Structures are given as C-alpha cells and as structure tokens.
Amino acid sequence: MGNINWLEKLGWEEDQVEELRMTGYAYIRQGKYDIALDFFQALTVLDPNNLYDAQTVGAIYVQLGQFDEAIKALEHALKLEGDHTPTLVNLCKALFMADKKDEGLKLAEILKDDKNPAVASQAEALLLAFAPSPLPKSKKKKS
C-alpha cells in the first residue's frame, strides 16, 4: 500500500486534496477531533510526505487524550522535518501528558530558548506547569 500513488489512482489534483484538508480543519475548529482525525489520516495516505498533515494527526491525538498515539504520530512528523517547532511543542505536551516527564522537561528546556516567542512562551508555560517546584523555605519563629 505504501508504494501506491493514491492521488494518481483517484485522478485527484491538489485542489481536491486542499478541499479535504480544509474540511478536516473545519472539524478541528468545531472541536470535532474524532471526525477531523479521519480526514487528516486520509491526507497522510494521499501525501505521506506532507509535514502539516502528519503533525496535525499528532496534535489531534493530543486533543483526544491519546498521548501514546500522539507521540508516535509526532515522531513520524519529525522524521519529515526534525526541527519543526510546532511539532516539537506538541510532542512536548504529549510527553508530559503521557507521564514521560523527564523527556518532556528536556525538550521544554530546549524549546524555551527558541527564537520564536510563541514557541518559547509555550515551553515556559509547560515548564511552569510540569517542572518540580522547589520546596518552600521554612520560616523560623523568632523567640
């Protein structure tokens, strides 16, 4: 199945693929992630090298609370482009939510220094939410 050019078999052009993508995106905007997932999984079959579709599958799995599936999908997307920061942020979220805290902390520490302020601030927020907080200093009573 991996060697079949489905676009050619279906006789589809890029405009049909884009319509499918926009329909999937509309379901995401409505919060209907389970329906959107079907669209984006189909898109990854039609164009297995499309980073946007691959990382969107991972992001949808995060929204659905299927964190192990999210990690698999996001790692696949990173094989297409290893330094794609939106994918890395979603992977970081998925790692924390899958209780893989050490991996999430390492990735968040790297991302907090990203030149893109949106990425850096999301990483900072994840660190604030998931990093172990220092124990409060005990206050000694004065006698």
Functional labels for PLM-detected ranges:
Residues 2-19:
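TPR-adjacent "capping" and linker segments in tetratricopeptide-repeat scaffold/adaptor proteins
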